[in-house]
Amino acid sequence: MLQQRSLKTLTRAVGVGLHSGQRVELTLRPAQPDTGIVFRRVDLPQPVDIPVRAEAVTDTRLASTIAQGSAKVHTVEHLMSACAGLGIDNLHVDITAEEVPILDGSSASFVFLLQSAGIVRQNAPKRFIRVTRPVQVREGEGADAKWAQLAPYHGYKLSFEIGFDHPAVDATGQRVEFDLGRGNYRRDIARARTFGFTRDVELMRANGLALGGGLDNAIVMDDYKVLNSDGLRYDDEFVKHKILDAMGDLHLLGKPLLAAYSAFRSGHALNNRLLRALLAQRDAWEVVTFEDERQAPGGFAQPAQAW
């Protein structure tokens, strides 16, 4: 039986929120089978649980935000991406502020935290949402067009194309494909950092955003070049970060996907629209388990090795 996964023990991290600049403490704790991933705002007078699901997403401007009533958690996508890449099904996430810490701007620190705590198999079948026919969402026309699609695939594959007209981005790949069954999330995707432009950062800070951002947790560019002294971690780091974000956004479905995801200039908003469109078309998906691990797609049978 292909089993669900959680942590062996708890682990903690301290950092700042990318947009709020607030200090935040994060505690990742084991959870029982079939719990799912549940965020808990422990800083509130009465702690509030926010279970991960597509419908819990309430804001997608600059990041993915989930909420339960008035309690919110912003910028969940990098932690969720690490959970997707490592196959984590059940997890308690205790947080002392309204934004997940940005750490180094990628998901690598979250991967390290999760693997340091130990990943264990649980005595319950891992449940997938398997896409049975294509579902697509689109936005804009012509040069402004954006789209994202899920199609049937025996595994989990993501293909993303960006369209940034910038010398530093043009010099790298603007399209990448990652197959969880053939690649290695930790090696190929996890270290890709979020990125932004100085002109946008100045505007965001004037509006009380990006207060925790800087060269130590993002790729920053002026109109011509990358400003980080250490350059890029991957030749195609920009588009690989979009794959990282997409994996996090799609893991907000609450169950791992068996599908081929493809997108052109998509973002948090379109990714969430895609999940909602999928769920609304009940004939486009089914829940499946694998009693025989040998029948499971590649990339899901064995937990990733520790660093």
UniProtKB/Swiss-Prot annotation:
It catalyses: a UDP-3-O-[(3R)-3-hydroxyacyl]-N-acetyl-alpha-D-glucosamine + H2O = a UDP-3-O-[(3R)-3-hydroxyacyl]-alpha-D-glucosamine + acetate. Disulfide bonds: none annotated. GO terms for cellular component: membrane. One of its GO terms (biological process) is lipid A biosynthetic process. The keyword Zinc applies. Its EC number is 3.5.1.108. Keywords: Hydrolase, Lipid A biosynthesis, Lipid biosynthesis, Lipid metabolism, Metal-binding, Zinc. Its cofactor is Zn(2+). InterPro entries: Ribosomal_Su5_D2-typ_SF, UDP-acyl_GlcNac_deAcase, UDP-acyl_GlcNac_deAcase_C, UDP-acyl_N-AcGlcN_deAcase_N. One of its GO terms (molecular function) is metal ion binding. It comes from the Bacteria. The keyword Lipid biosynthesis applies. The active site is at H268 (proton donor). Zn(2+) binds at H78, H241, D245. Pathway: Glycolipid biosynthesis; lipid IV(A) biosynthesis; lipid IV(A) from (3R)-3-hydroxytetradecanoyl-[acyl-carrier-protein] and UDP-N-acetyl-alpha-D-glucosamine: step 2/6. Gene3D superfamilies: lpxc deacetylase, domain 1 (3.30.230.20), lpxc deacetylase, domain 2 (3.30.1700.10). PANTHER family: UDP-3-O-ACYL-N-ACETYLGLUCOSAMINE DEACETYLASE 1, MITOCHONDRIAL-RELATED (PTHR33694:SF1). Belongs to the LpxC family. Catalyzes the hydrolysis of UDP-3-O-myristoyl-N-acetylglucosamine to form UDP-3-O-myristoylglucosamine and acetate, the committed step in lipid A biosynthesis. This is UDP-3-O-acyl-N-acetylglucosamine deacetylase. It comes from Verminephrobacter eiseniae (strain EF01-2). The lineage of its organism: Bacteria, Pseudomonadati, Pseudomonadota, Betaproteobacteria, Burkholderiales.
